[in-house]
């Protein structure tokens, strides 16, 4: 018996096909306009074609989530407007630190680097940019892969060699200009140099759910690796050089490895050492709390929760 399955659809400006020509070939071949993960379907000689169909449909359901993204969050416009007013867009990022069987909170100040897929314009950035095709409700920061917070972004406290994560985080902004506090709780994902590889497909899929086409225009070509390089290029040479620092948290009297040292400036956007340590962190909010204290006699508070693919808004007492 021969099972033929053919599917065509657009996924982030990608059209590709799935075909099974033989019932026991063990793999679905993929063809497309960009590198996409291979779908391996190991089957025993007695496996029935319906099992193959079930696996293919499961894969399609996961991939098609990017074609039907989650609608824009009702808090998005106000949040972006408030952050734009900040003299320095910093916030507190809280994570969970695992040590043996104990879990303790960790917090640090980080710099907001814009919404994912909407990198802020920097005329000094020499990196090639993706076309402005998408918008999202996702926050971005940059970090060093050697930082202690990297394993804290995983679900189990284990280190993340490249792309991965999904651990719980909370981001807290105090916007003094509007006297508003924003707390965003959700999951954080680390994006490394392997982001276009099949091994990082689960990270891309989680983020793609929140990427919405602007004006239904998918005529351009958008690339994940290019977006990460653009974030690296948006940093100053001195900030890029910080990714050639000695390993954070190591003893000062330990001699750093060749090429590492403080105070370096990096002009080359493909600097091997700096890029090896550079990561983009994408925060996917699942709950947002907004407290407006601009009127001391009538404070306002709203809670937003992402449930079943849509946002629910509730007004609360502050």
Region spans (language model):
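Intrinsically disordered, low-complexity basic segments at termini and long loops, enriched
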Residues: 1-42
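Binding-site signature for planar aromatic cofactors or substrates
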Residues: 44-318
């Amino acid at each position: 018996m021969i099972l033929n399955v053919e599917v065509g659809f657009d996924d982030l400006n990608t059209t590709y096909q799935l075909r099974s020509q033989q019932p026991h070939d063990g793999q679905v071949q993929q063809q497309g306009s960009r590198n996409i993960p291979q779908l391996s379907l190991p089957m025993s000689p007695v496996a029935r074609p319906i099992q193959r169909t079930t696996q293919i449909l499961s894969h399609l359901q996961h991939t098609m989530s990017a074609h039907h993204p989650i609608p824009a969050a009702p808090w998005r416009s106000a949040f972006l407007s408030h952050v734009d007013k900040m003299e320095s867009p910093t916030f507190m990022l809280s994570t969970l630190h695992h040590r043996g069987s104990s879990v303790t909170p960790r917090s640090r100040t980080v710099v907001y680097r814009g919404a994912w897929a909407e990198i802020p314009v920097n005329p000094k950035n020499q990196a090639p940019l993706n076309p402005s095709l998408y918008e999202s409700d996702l926050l971005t920061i940059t970090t060093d892969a050697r930082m202690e917070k990297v394993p804290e972004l995983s679900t189990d406290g284990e280190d993340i060699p490249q792309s991965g994560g999904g651990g719980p985080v909370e981001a807290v902004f105090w916007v003094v200009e509007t006297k508003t506090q924003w707390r965003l709780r959700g999951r954080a994902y680390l994006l490394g140099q392997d982001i276009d590889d099949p091994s990082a497909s689960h990270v891309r899929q989680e983020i793609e759910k929140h990427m919405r086409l602007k004006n239904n225009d998918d005529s351009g070509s958008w690339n994940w690796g290019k977006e990460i390089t653009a974030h690296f290029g948006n940093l100053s040479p001195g900030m890029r050089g910080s990714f050639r620092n000695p390993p954070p948290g190591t003893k000062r009297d330990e001699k750093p490895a060749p090429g590492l040292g403080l105070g370096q400036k990096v002009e080359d956007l493909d600097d091997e050492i700096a890029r090896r340590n550079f990561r983009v962190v994408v925060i996917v909010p699942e709950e947002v709390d907004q407290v407006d204290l601009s009127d001391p006699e009538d404070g306002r508070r709203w809670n937003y929760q992402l449930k079943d693919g849509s946002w629910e808004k509730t007004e609360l007492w502050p």
